[in-house]
Amino acid sequence: SDSDVPHTRGAAGIGLVRTETAILYDQSDEVQTTRLRELLKSAEGVPVLLRTCDTRADDDAPWAGETQDRLRGNRLFKPQIRALLCAATDGDLRVVFPMIKDVADWDRCVDEVNTCRDELLAEGCETGPMMLGCVVDMPSAAVMAGDMMEHGAQLMAVDIEDLTRYTLGLVQNPTAAVNQLTNP
């Protein structure tokens, strides 16, 4: 119904869409593309801001360790980028990368997007435009935001909770936080 469409309720866009859970259930780029296309079509033209997989070393989620290792090997990141590029033909997709600590990290993400786009085009797949940016969730990203913009970042999404936590050297695990306070 119209009441389920974001812009009929006054929304100028949808975001920030997290992707960790969807990727962990099915990592194939085909399934991810289908889900993303459904999301973009339901948005009916309003921008959708999506954050790529965020697997922190300090995350207590049971999958974090395995996922972190797999991301380093590009086995999760590449299918996600391919799915995003394919789905971008169906709407206004804006993508931010979390845990970018410096310009070199940013450049690696952009290089991977360009590599995936080239591969898809060589395979005869249509790709759509995506506005790219990063999540400012680390102090170094906040300090280097201007440099990243000079390197092509088109938007920044500030994760104030993580930025504050990392700036102050706090931990995410509540038990560890209590231990840190009681046993400095």
Cite the ranges covered by each PLM segment.
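Conserved alpha/beta-domain cores
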Residues: 1-184
